[in-house]
């Protein structure tokens, strides 16, 4: 934190730990470490986003960075020309849609698959990939009265950041407009996850594309 560039790598983060998670899961490190002063949290999945992040870090003067990566091979969703900007969310779909999924890491693929399924049903949503928390975009979506679903494959660092930022800015938010899904229980209590495949764990936590569709359709 004293002008030193230190990047911490978390490999197989979130529920990507999968069947190796009998002893531990990388789901609570992010909400614990984000309490460190000046730490920048970045949670990525797309390989091109990863390259863009590494180029950003290599420029120097970034301080403490927690870079969280997936284990599985991931599909590219961004162009090679992507320029990473810390604190920026990337919107996929209609920005005027009344419902928005906010996610990060491998959750972006579940979000995009849910978006596709809902589009086939005649409903358009937006999906926001937030590898790092975008305070301005979150505030904008809230003030526009959007229905927001935080879908996080960890203990919920984006929603925690959201609560802090809305309080800091004095922006009122309605619990009726905000829904959260994470590795916490539905009562938002932290828990230990058992070992399982990614698919099994995503289903357990209600974070699969199918679960996101059902949550948006029946609960929002």
Regions found by a protein language model. Give the residues of each.
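Conserved thiamine diphosphate
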Residues: 1-100
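Thiamine diphosphate
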Residues: 17, 65, 70-220
């Amino acid at each position: 934190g004293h002008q030193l560039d230190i990047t911490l790598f978390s490999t197989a983060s979130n529920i990507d730990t999968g069947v190796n998670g009998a002893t531990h899961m990388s789901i609570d490190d992010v909400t614990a470490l984000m309490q460190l002063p000046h730490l920048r949290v970045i949670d990525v999945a797309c390989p091109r986003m990863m390259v863009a992040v590494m180029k950003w870090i290599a420029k120097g003067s970034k301080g403490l960075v927690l870079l969280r990566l997936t284990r599985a091979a991931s599909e590219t969703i961004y162009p090679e020309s992507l320029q990473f900007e810390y604190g920026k969310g990337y919107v996929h779909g209609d920005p005027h849609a009344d419902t928005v999924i906010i996610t990060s890491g491998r959750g972006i693929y579940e979000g995009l698959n849910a978006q596709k399924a809902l589009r086939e049903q005649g409903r358009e949503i937006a999906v926001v990939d937030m590898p790092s928390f975008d305070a301005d975009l979150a505030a904008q979506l809230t003030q526009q009265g959007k229905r927001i679903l935080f879908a996080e494959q960890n203990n919920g660092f984006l929603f925690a950041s959201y609560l802090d930022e809305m309080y800091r800015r004095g922006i009122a938010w309605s619990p009726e407009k905000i829904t959260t899904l994470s590795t916490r229980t539905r009562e938002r209590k932290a828990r230990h996850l058992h070992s399982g495949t990614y698919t099994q764990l995503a289903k357990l936590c209600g974070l699969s594309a199918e679960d996101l569709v059902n949550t948006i359709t029946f609960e929002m």
